[in-house]
Amino acid sequence: HKDDDEVLIALGEIESELNAKKYGLVWERDEEAVDIQMRDNIPVFTECVDKEISTTTGGVNFLLEGDNLHSLRLLEKTHAGRIDLIYIDPPYNTNNKEFIYDDSFVDKTDAFRHSKWLSFMHERLLLVKQLLSKNGSIFISIDSNEQAQLKLLCDEIFGEENFVDMISWFKEASPSNDAQYFSNDIEYILVYARDKSVWRPHRLPLNEKQMKYYTNPDNDSRGPWNSATYTCNKSKEQRPSLY
């Protein structure tokens, strides 16, 4: 009966909605041609012997030139779980710059530019995760245009519990006086650990100038230290509102 069919269709749609994702990113996913090609093909890289740079320090480093998805697929087979640190500088998908998706430039008028960018990043970050060692971490440069989307995407792939921090850095030496609204001087670096419970940063040692502020008059076993006040270093007369 037609009415019964319509009811069944409506119930099916309701069930789909109930089973749908409740929180996180939802976008129009689209496979690139390179994804389809690699279902039945394995990327092979050819060594350029004439471009080899020999050193006497030992160890072998190499530079892969080509589609980054091809490179990641290859590294997945040779370096899975072996890389301690990854830094990537993906396309920012800004309005004044285009990026290539599926061998075509995606311009600012493309209605699916954000979905294409997310699909682009999703496939690559899934592979990147497989490369990280247990103590590994990834640093990802981004600006405000896709920072919010990238954070949710990385939470989904690496796990929200493995988010380390978001570093803000000044990309401009001085504010832009010709900005229409606010001067956009900051970009970001998202930091995720493969397993935050075991990841530890490698801190830089203090230089001689920095060390002169630290002493160890009481022979503390933990090393030189510097005393500091836990409150504001202003007097009651200078900052009465703090007292």
Predicted regions and their residues:
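RNase H-like polynucleotidyl transferase catalytic core
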Residues: 164-176
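Conserved Class I SAM-dependent methyltransferase catalytic core
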Residues: 114-167
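Conserved nucleotide-binding/hydrolysis micro-motifs of P-loop NTPases
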Residues: 91-94, 145-147, 171-174, 195-198
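Flexible, glycine-/basic-rich loop-and-beta segments that form/coincide
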Residues: 174-233, 238, 242
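Beta-sheet entry/capping signal
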Residues: 60-62, 82-87, 135-139, 147, ...
